[in-house]
Amino acid sequence: MDDITQNLESVEKNPDIGMGRGVYISTYGCQMNVNDTERMYALLEMQNFVPVTDPKKASLIIINSCSVREKPVHKVYSEVGTYKYMKRKNPELKIGVGGCVGQQEKENLMKTQPMIDFVFGTDQIDSLPQLVAKSFAGERRLVNSRFEHRSPYHIETLVRNPGVATYVNITKGCDNFCTFCVVPYTRGREKSRPVQHILTDIRHLVKRGVKEVTLLGQNVNSYQGDEGIDFADLLAKVAKETDVERIRYTTSHPKDFNQKLVDVMAEHSNKIMEYIHLPFQAGSTKVLERMNRNYTREEYLERIAMIQKGLPNVCFSTDIIVGFPGETEEDFQDTLNMVTEVGFETIFAFSYSPRPFTKAAKFEDQLPEDVKNERLNRLFDVHEAMAFERVKRYEGTTMKVLVENVDRDHGKMQGRSTGNKLVHFLGTADLIGKTVDVKITKAFPAVFRGEMI
């Protein structure tokens, strides 16, 4: 029996805890949080809890939270406030907070939110059944936020209904300590999963009908597996040693992106998708230095050129922070120029939000909110205009689309191209899980429309 199965079977199953009660989990933040929520549901189902979509029907409510920016932190406190009225009507209702806010704000949550029964950190998801059992036994104000310092990272993928495409964690935490980022403090130091655990997960998922996996981590490129295996080696192993049809990965750090990885992607282009999410965060070298990103503007562009040379059809997306402390109008123009020079298909942009524990939160040259918001709107305007022009080149082309599901709003089939474009077309549900050729008839930045051929 392998370690993965042993780890899962070590979870004590006690149906008397759940007793068929409803559990509702509210999820904010990144794909890592979405994966964590799946794990929570799977663990609680083992205790005879039943997932519900309406919190009013739940006996257990968990908020799986994000603290990368200030707004989702405020949403947690607001959401707890809405549930306290439900708890007054039903004293048996249990409320827990996990995720990055649970890790970061545990003391303040316990101090200011008396309706919360328990708080757990990002490394303590597997302690959830025990916390819940104690809570339903009458214990209150429980906290478990200890970081697990064992290495490597031994948690298997738990997905209840994986569908056609799903995610597989390969790393956890981050050692980069960008001055704006709270992740090292909420997710801990970087750990990598053993290679064979990852491969076993993917093989199990393929048996359940999964066609595409995305290898997931805060910085997948810094993966350090057993026997000196790096991320490029891992990617090659997934391509050669599993039957999964499509492979993606996210997120990459520009400082760690190398020629070896490009070569592996080119060698296995039949499986590894031609899409890379490569955050540049700011277009100014001065700002990048203050962010502790460990690359310059020129070095980022050199990596883009290296990737495009080896993968001519590659599509890029990126993350951008606008209004970082000390950012001048000239610095911001460098960011706008970077967007148009690279021609990103998609951008995920936010105004800078000071986070606890981070170095940048202590910088004295913070920008006013109105300046940050104005620059963010300008960035969106520039990218939108560029994106509308760029996508026209796809009209009339044929794309290989992995059909994932039915678009609920329009009744059409939808899936993803190799370049991660969302494509809608007329078809039937029996196409789900198949890769079909679709001719693009109309292209918009957010979605393409086409006809199956």
Curated annotation (Swiss-Prot):
Domain Radical SAM core as annotated: residue spans: 160-389
Binding site for [4Fe-4S] cluster 1: C30, C66, C100
Broad class of where this protein is predominantly found: cytoplasm
Protein name as catalogued: tRNA-2-methylthio-N(6)-dimethylallyladenosine synthase
Record localization: Cytoplasm
One Pfam assignment: Radical_SAM
SUPFAM superfamilies: Radical SAM enzymes (SSF102114)
Gene: miaB
InterPro entries on file: Elp3/MiaA/NifB-like_rSAM, Methylthiotransferase, Methylthiotransferase_CS, Methylthiotransferase_N, Methylthiotransferase_N_sf, MiaB_methiolase, rSAM, rSAM_horseshoe
EC number: 2.8.4.3
MF annotations from Gene Ontology: 4 iron, 4 sulfur cluster binding; metal ion binding; N6-isopentenyladenosine methylthiotransferase activity
Assembly behavior: Monomer.
Function: Catalyzes the methylthiolation of N6-(dimethylallyl)adenosine (i(6)A), leading to the formation of 2-methylthio-N6-(dimethylallyl)adenosine (ms(2)i(6)A) at position 37 in tRNAs that read codons beginning with uridine.
Record's catalysed reaction(s): N(6)-dimethylallyladenosine(37) in tRNA + (sulfur carrier)-SH + AH2 + 2 S-adenosyl-L-methionine = 2-methylsulfanyl-N(6)-dimethylallyladenosine(37) in tRNA + (sulfur carrier)-H + 5'-deoxyadenosine + L-methionine + A + S-adenosyl-L-homocysteine + 2 H(+)
Organism annotation: Bdellovibrio bacteriovorus (strain ATCC 15356 / DSM 50701 / NCIMB 9529 / HD100)
Segments forming domain MTTase N-terminal: 21-137
UniProtKB keywords: 4Fe-4S, Cytoplasm, Iron, Iron-sulfur, Metal-binding, S-adenosyl-L-methionine, Transferase, tRNA processing
Similarity comment: family membership: Belongs to the methylthiotransferase family. MiaB subfamily.
Cofactor note: Binds 2 [4Fe-4S] clusters. One cluster is coordinated with 3 cysteines and an exchangeable S-adenosyl-L-methionine.
Cofactor(s) listed: [4Fe-4S] cluster
GO cellular component: cytosol
Taxonomic classification: Bacteria, Pseudomonadati, Bdellovibrionota, Bdellovibrionia, Bdellovibrionales
